[in-house]
């Protein structure tokens, strides 16, 4: 039964990715099956979080003219009409624009006695019997929390500390110097050893037993209460459970069910110290002390005013205290409405009854956040829809270079500056460039998924060095040693005494230089930093002979590593190969049984693993047909299928920042929180092959013989662009390319100067590269903050419109998308990822403490998977305060993703019908979809699940949202 309950509530656990591959996500992803407004209402209650900004935030935008008066009035009137109170329009407008932000100040006694009808109205809402109050108050609490409130204890803190200490140690990915033993047995198996539990029960049986002993009335809700207590850790465990190929999940498996069993164990363990140890006993105790229990819970939840707490401590009658408290609440709420009515209503009559007015104000307080939000969105939609609809296509000739960037909002400025410098045009595409790969970097031993989190790549690509790299190895080893030393300094209480003395000068450069003298330090570190050798990729598919050879070599190296780790011995290739063949052929004669057991079980040296590795290696690289299709799909995706210029520049992006656990959040979201350089190097290499171009001609795409594809990387922190693999370029083209490089450097500088104006304390654009290595810098760049929309269409439709680095820009030419395949791919990929990014920024802004990550200043890295605040606590989900706020003022403007698609309406609808996940987001209004149909001169939007005309430029431009 426990597993069934768990399956029902797991959707309420937010998404989470480890910080090394940070993926932006909607923390309310589990609510997306519901309409946006209803989902926010439920989530606010469940997470105890704010889901809209405070009224004064929106009022300020209204005063600044950002929220348009006519749009606010229209949305307000529609709401009032829906509840039959449109006669209060003038009063309602004044309430939300002038009074609501001071709501709490109206809850005071005044000279005007509240109307008796108001007293009755609030009496019915506030005064409840003790049984009802008790059940409402404990609904979201664990039993230990309830008892802490009643007995004024802190046992829950002790329980949580025990839970978190175990969980952080079990889930550790190499941070601690003392690894927990027996983790390969799984979380619950390791926990039984950790706690010395003598039980044969599995995690489900164990959790079921404890829940039976606790006997909560609503078992499903009680399980959810436990998981939401530390929902960051629950989210990470959910991530691991959902990603079975995650390396640490394979070697140290964990599940939400095991985590629940651990949590319940500690709660039950400490409840044994109480006279009450289950809900049956709690109910019996409540029957004897109903009023006192209710008061203690009100106090624990910070609801009971201090004067009543004083009376409680003075042993006043609990019944008198509760009666007085509820009575005062009734009168104060009545006074509040009376005070507001005195300001808004000149006289009361039958049409404007005071209880109707109270109901109106109650509904306005419930709805005002959404009214303001929609009005803000509609104001932007009106502005941009008319601009996009009326923009004219510019025909550019004699293009020297087409630069393809990620759709990321941070690409908009540099694209704009490049286009202004000469014969350049730019395109936007998801940053993995249509090349999803599992990438194994040179000098690294693990895969990186360089593709959106929605995709599991089918192709594996290895990076291999092309030449000698002794200098790289030497410098890399120095840097690696220093990095490990620094980790020891953070994580080991003893080794720093020895290491700092031995390497003091090197620590001085980092610990002080990066904080006090970042400019000078940047020069030193650029000299020390290991320069990666020239590398190539395993682009072509391996033959069967190659697969056999590499698989065998891999296992031989595993055997050598095992001997080194387990027995401190070195064995040569021949001996390791003989041992490997003996194990695979099951000829164990003469092999020490202990060695055989270790190799087979701990290191998976067996026939089954060998065959699996060969299957895995069969996924390395692409066939020629696959390579042709890869380039064809890419060129069609961006609409570059004819008039292909001399240079096609494929520019991925990444970021650089030091002392920043959230660094991967600044990298490419479409590459799983990594940078996309390998993707563009692979794609460019394939596109430059003659046989691939011949294959493309057969599908109608002619790439001129002298066209060169050059890969590059855009560092979004410094706005520098670096090109790679330029040796493929003939000498005769060097001068032209040098001009491009020079122009791009100018564009980079102009972009830095533009960004410096928005970055606090940045000074000039020249200072921006220094911020990337400054350890005291909590905000190396704004990242994706202020994102507001995505434009799917031609660059000519946006080129002359001020997008202010707030739009994702996906190139799309609907005329060549005959079967809707391209649009469906956009809707199933960039569209959904864009919503994740947008919603994470939205909720990290509305409630940074609950749905964001809090301030970076107090963060500490834990287990190499995330951060917590202070010395222990929950894993922080969402984005840090410094990403979305500055000096207490929101920098990010939380609105839903405004998605503009330039295509005929019927084409968009047809594609959306086939992408159910995207359709759900549109119909449930998690995004705002606007269709720009330039053929008809009409823009459409969705309203209440139906398509409606938004602007019709054939007649009078009328905005009908």
UniProtKB/Swiss-Prot annotation:
- What keywords would UniProt list here? Cell inner membrane, Cell membrane, Membrane, Metal-binding, Transport, Zinc
Q: Which residues bind Zn(2+)?
A: 406, 408, 653, 668
Q: Name one Pfam family in it.
A: DabA
Q: Which residues form a coiled coil?
A: none
Q: Does the keyword Protein transport apply?
A: no
One annotated GO molecular function:
zinc ion binding
Task: Give the top-rank taxon of the lineage listed in the UniProt record for this protein.
Answer: Bacteria
User: Per the record, what is one GO cellular component?
Assistant: plasma membrane
Subcellular location field: Cell inner membrane
Membrane topology, as annotated, equals: Peripheral membrane protein
Where does the UniProt entry say this protein principally localizes?
A: membrane
Q: Which cofactor does it need?
A: Zn(2+)
Subunit record text: Forms a complex with DabB.
Instruction: Summarize the protein's role.
Output: Part of an energy-coupled inorganic carbon pump.
Family membership, please give it: Belongs to the inorganic carbon transporter (TC 9.A.2) DabA family.
According to UniProt, the name of this protein is Probable inorganic carbon transporter subunit DabA
Gene field:
dabA
